[in-house]
Amino acid sequence: PAKTYSADEMSLEIEVALNSYLNKGQYDPVFEDKISSLSDEGYDNILNQIYNYGQNLEKYKNLYDKFDEEGFRDFFLPHLNSMSKNHTATGETFNKIGKTDILIQDEKGINVFIAECKLWKGESELSKAIDQLLDRYVTWRDEKVALIVFNKDMKKFTELMTKAVEKLKEHPQFDKYIGKRKDSSYQFTFKHPDDSEKII
């Protein structure tokens, strides 16, 4: 295999997954009837799943310290695939002119959700990440997207998030800051780079 894991690493990964699956409630992963290419509820459900799964991963520093962007992405994909019997989540999937980190499609092959994963390297890199997402992966029909940023160093995290939000507001395609979804999750709308009337 391209990458091997120790028994301790596998144990940690299984524990994270089990904690997420067994912690039933409003974030029960199955939502096969609620997700569609136009559903805000389905979009919120995906974002909540990613947020809560990531929040649980924060407890296992020995595991995530070894992850690069691809490692984080691969860790989330099985969980995203468990959310619906009628949708498929894939990684490094070609869309438009490049390979996006996470692509969820329905059974007809219609894109439902696109996400790009990045390690935090300063707020100046956020604009490049948005450019990459909008210019390379998002077609005119794609509306539900996310930029997932992983930060291994939690020092001055509140200040970091404030700077990140302000930086995103400066992006040329910025349309509106909708607000904070959760402690470290923020929602924006952007204009499509090829059509300013198309909002993403």
Regions from the PLM with identified roles:
Residues 1-42:
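Internal, Lys/Arg-enriched amphipathic helical interaction segments that engage polyanionic partners
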Residues 38, 42, 68-72, 125, ...:
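Short amphipathic alpha-helical segments
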Residues 42-91:
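Acidic-basic catalytic patches of nuclease active cores, encompassing PD-(D/E)XK
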Residues 91-92, 101-102:
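Pyridoxal 5′-phosphate
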Residues 95-99, 122:
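Short acidic loop-to-helix transition motifs that present clustered carboxylates
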Residues 103-114:
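Active-site beta-strand-loop-beta-strand hairpin of nuclease catalytic cores
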Residues 119-172:
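Catalytic cores of nucleic-acid endonucleases
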Residues 152-200:
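Domain-level recognition of nuclease-like catalytic cores that cleave nucleotide substrates
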